[in-house]
Every structure is written in structure tokens, then in C-alpha cells.
């Protein structure tokens, strides 16, 4: 954890209960869905509790933030921690910081749309950010998720993410994914390493434009990794 250690946590989240036993071999269940005539992948991580985490605060929207000039967050490092460790972040949604490194589609995650029941958290997808991914996040407060039309926009974003050389080398169409994350001030967010764009609405083209700008940032040591 970097020098600004988390203190006075607001609404700390620890979603993996202590009484829950983790299966030895978590699996990624991939389903092929047809949404509005478009075939998309939907993923659910099963056999593993959601990654526990804690945030000192929620990142707040900035009126002048755009795709080209999103919120720049302080770099919290890229430390690898053991799966199941509670990871701590200065703000949520995090755009850097400690994360799991289990592999096998657990951390980093495979590029896909993850439905609201997927048992994942920042410690999973922050590893994707380190590898140059862009992650779209959606919120389901009190279980009230976005409408099917909006979820279709998120799936379209995943389906049409910009290609990169490393994505091709990794055997995927694009290094983007979408996942539920409730601990944020707006219904949606687009996240790259140290970059966050908080959104009240989600449009697939905005997500694609953000990804085109911020995928595979050259300063990332592991940007070519899968």
C-alpha cells in the first residue's frame, strides 16, 4: 500500500464472508447471449467468494472531466497480494493498487460482460488495468441494476472494444470488460490505469472512445500482458 494508508474508512466493504469456504478451483462460466441480434459473451465467476476490499472514500465527479481529460487518480502501486486478502484503496472506484494474481481467468479477468451476480471485485479487475485494459463499471444499488437497454449498451461496448496488437496476441478481440461495482458515486464509470471517468448514463460509443484513448498506456510496465 502506498504512503497514504487508508484511515477512517467510509462504508468499508468486505463482501466475502468469513464463514464462506472457497472452492479449490474457481471457474469462469461463459455463456453466449444474443442481444438485439448481437452475439455477446456473458461471464459469471463461480466457486469463489467476492474479493473483499475497503475504500477510504468515493471518488466524486468533476464537471470538466471528459474522455480526453478524465479524473487522474494518485497511483496506488501495483502490488500483488494473495487471493482472499482484503485490499485497501484511497478512493473507489480504484484505478490502481493492490490486486490478486491468480490467473486462470480470476485475476486478471477474461474480457467479457460480467453479470450482476459475478463474484468479483477490484482485486480482480485492477490486475486487468495493470495489463492495459479498460473496465466499464455499473452500479446495482439495493439490487436495482440498469435497464436491459442500458445493459445492452455495456455488452455492445465489450463486443466492439478497439483492437490492439497485444489483444490479438492474447487471442481476444479487445482488452475491455464490464462488471458490477456498487461502491461509487455515479451509476457508471470507465476506468483505465490511474484514469476514471464517472458517468450518470452509459453509451457504448463513449466507452469505445474512452478505450481507444486509454487502452495500453505506454507507461504501463505490463501493458502487453494478457
Predicted stretch roles:
Residues 1-24:
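Terminal targeting segments of Actinobacterial cell-envelope proteins
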